[in-house]
Regions:
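Short, contiguous alpha-helical
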Residues: 205
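Catalytic cores of Mg2+-dependent Asp-rich isoprenoid enzymes
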Residues: 1-200, 210-331
Length: 331
């Protein structure tokens, strides 16, 4: 494939990253050119599948008899996996989104095998190049898509293990891809990358609890809620934070987040200074959200949880500080 086609594909992935988050996009710039482009491609793929499942992007695929049959078989398997539950969306919308995910999975296999053409989506052109340069496992991409497929159905996590499994699929698997791009000195880095992903997604679950409830997605473990005398239906009550049972649940939940966070910080010991910047900023950003949850005494219902302007400025300054340190370390 011509170099210009590949370069153009990477540029489109870069633009997707920039449009999604200028703060995190800036943190990528500490990486070398080759690693930075690879991270853009991975992030663009993750953004794409997430938007498809949440309905933020209308999926378009080239329909064929083979793809239709693959989608049908995948749907049957997922229904069985979800104990016969009906999809969260009307059948037509469900089929469109699932078919898009099946098609993306097929294209990832083609990218791994070097069979992507110049006429394919730019993200697959870029990822095909990424596969040739880094030891990325196709399995981790498939795990991400499995997590997206789960969200096509009503979700009810019952235990901590089920919640961690979900977090692994949609967050830790991404981290396992990224550290293969960053490079690391010891395989222990993978364990800490897994905990970083779980820690971030556990915070996402709290941040989005009301929105997810409206979509039929209950990630907070039902059995744990019950042990604190909270019913799933109580999650629709904006006054729940005033209930002492919620305070009790939050103490347990936040302690679990802290344990994963304690492990996550050790990831940086295995990365070179330039590769530390992006995950360091991610950890710091989520820690700020976590601290805000603590400050609000667990009230994640009354107002959106997001980074303040001051926090964003603080992160921007830290990005530049870490980039300078990384540059000096490399000299």
């Amino acid at each position: 494939m011509e170099i210009q086609v590949i370069d153009d594909a990477y540029l489109q992935c870069q633009q997707i990253c920039k449009n999604a988050s200028t703060t995190f996009y800036s943190s990528f710039s500490a990486l070398g050119w080759e690693k930075r482009r690879a991270v853009h491609a991975v992030y663009a793929l993750c953004r794409w599948v997430d938007d498809i499942v949440d309905g933020d992007e209308e999926p378009t695929v080239e329909i064929s008899d083979e793809l239709t049959e693959q989608t049908k078989q995948r749907d049957l398997m997922l229904r069985e996996l979800h104990s016969g539950s009906e999809p969260s969306n009307p059948q037509e919308i469900h089929n469109q989104r699932l078919m898009a995910l099946v098609s993306i999975r097929n294209k990832l296999h083609q990218a791994k095998e070097g069979k992507i053409s110049p006429n394919d989506e730019p993200v697959f052109i870029a990822l095909q190049d990424v596969f040739t340069k880094f030891s990325i496992r196709l399995q981790d991409f498939e795990t991400i898509i499995e997590g997206m497929e789960d969200d096509l159905f009503p979700v009810m996590c019952n235990t901590w293990d089920e919640l961690r499994s979900y977090c692994y699929k949609v967050a830790s698997a991404v981290g396992l891809i990224l550290i293969e791009i960053y490079g690391y000195e010891d395989r222990a880095a993978r364990l800490h990358a897994i905990d970083l992903g779980i820690q971030m997604q556990l915070i996402n679950v709290l941040r989005d609890v009301s929105e997810d409830y409206g979509r039929g997605r209950i990630y907070l473990p039902k059995d744990v809620l019950s042990s604190h005398n909270i019913d799933v239906e109580d999650l629709s009550n904006p006054n729940l934070p005033q209930n002492p049972s919620w305070a009790s649940f939050m103490r347990e939940y936040l302690e679990v987040v802290r344990r994963h966070q304690t492990s996550a910080v050790h990831l940086f010991e295995y990365l070179d200074p330039r590769s530390r910047v992006q995950p360091r900023i991610m950890l710091d950003a989520y820690t700020k959200i976590f601290d805000e949850i603590v400050r609000r005494s667990g009230d994640v219902f009354s107002a959106p949880l997001k980074l303040s302007v001051t926090s964003k400025m603080s992160l921007w300054m830290k990005i530049n500080y870490l980039k300078i340190r990384a540059k000096l370390s490399a000299e």
